[in-house]
Amino acid sequence: MEAPRRRFFNCRPMLPGMVGALAGAIVAVKLGNPSLWLLGLWGVALGAFALVRRWEWFALPLFFGLLLLRGALTPTVEVPAGTYPISGTVINRPARRQLSTTAVLYPVYISGTRVPGALQLSVPAAARPAYGETLFCTVTLEEDPTVHCQGPFVVMYAGRARGGISTNPSRGEGFYGWSLAARERLEGVAGALFYPWDGPAKGILLGDKSDVDFLTYEAYRRSGLLHLLTVSGLHVGVAGAVILALIRGRRRWLRMALAWTLVALFCLLTGLAPSALRAAVMLLCFHLGLQLRRQDDGLSQLGCALILLLLLEPRYLLCNGFCLSFGCIYGLVCLSRPLSRLLPGGGQRRGSLLAGAFSVFFATAPLLSRVGGDLSWVGIPLSLLAIPLAPFLLVPGWAAMLLYPLLPQAARAVALVPRGVLLLLQSVATLAPWEGLSVPYCGDLPLILWYAGILLVSDLFLPNARRPAYLGWSVLFVALVLWMTALV
């Protein structure tokens, strides 16, 4: 009797679906051609046919085609460079320099006509518009601006304010307008509670780095702790765990619905960063799996989050935080177990923590090279110190900010714990030695090979703990050579 064939990949349909969605998003972003709809229809038809025939790889062409169709509907820049009167609502303040402040406006009206996308605007530092305010000014738009993401919105225009600036202090309408006003008030509360560390506190608790000075930003970056200044999966995970702990009870679906609502509110108040949205979707999939009594599968949760967010906006691939967030979890899912077997103490908790830190470092290294080119070895042990401290900053920090309008003195007492954690993180980031290296830019081919090698090294490929992953390590070695020699 013939032995049953083993699958090459121990996975669900989300793995080919994730590959198809990534490929479709890359093609859509690189080409940006409205005629992609024809190829997209072919992909969807092939995926539907494979689904009817119950072929396991049906998700690959299906989501590839859907992403092409979504890309064909993506708007392009419609306004040429020049000077125009503009108006828009301030939704983010990503940076502040000595002489200027950067503000992101959405929706944007240029010469009275609404245009797709958001506008990144440089205004004088004295102006400092508040969240939710409507800003009116004359702007000189740049030619060929770099398309990127700020929060959930795609920045398609960039410019500098000219002449006078006027603002309408009334916040936007609806629930989103309320959330912007609430975020502005929370930033004022954070400044009162956590001074002189209010800049890092606003970054860690609210995702606003506009008050983080250059020296502090560089200290966090060079020490490998920059991820703490951005609201990410760590923050959403802590928020979700605390919410579930506070609403214990027998009605599980009611608990989950309330937890999802509060996590969504948390993401809204922290700027709807793509990394936070990724964590929220994964948390939703995890809770649904628990309620439906399904086996926990990190790769399927990651694939579901990736597919949903790319269908929402394919140009999220241009967002560094989005890519680093997915790269981090991808490394944890694929590399934690293989590395825990190689490192000393692999069967113990400290070995698992060390394997997780190395997994994140290896998975995000090529992406970091495309952002700045510096890799910090110090970030590995410092992350082992900083991540366990994060709940002691996030939970009492948010509790103090929410308590401050009612009981200011009690809020200041609660804030003593996060102030101590902030002081410790600031000292560690400032005093930590710079032990790293500058690496060349990782091209597209080495990047693809690198992540393919990570998958082939993992237990998802021909799962067998006794089998050395020769193929995976070979692919990683080839990717490393191509990366370091900059041949491609």
Regions found by a protein language model. Give the residues of each.
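Flexible glycine-rich surface loops and low-complexity tracts that mediate binding to linear polymers
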Residues: 87-90, 131-147
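Hydrophobic alpha-helical transmembrane segments in multi-pass membrane proteins
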Residues: 16, 20, 55-60, 214-382, ...
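Beta-strand/loop nucleic-acid-binding surfaces
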Residues: 112-129
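N-terminal leader/targeting segments
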Residues: 1-79, 155-156, 174, 278, ...
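Membrane-interface amphipathic/re-entrant loop segments adjacent to transmembrane helices
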Residues: 169, 173-178, 184, 369-381, ...
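Short aromatic-glycine-enriched beta-strand elements
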Residues: 95-106
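Aromatic-rich juxtamembrane segments at the membrane interface
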Residues: 2-11, 151-282, 287-288, 438
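Structural detector for short beta-strands of small beta-barrel domains
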Residues: 81-97
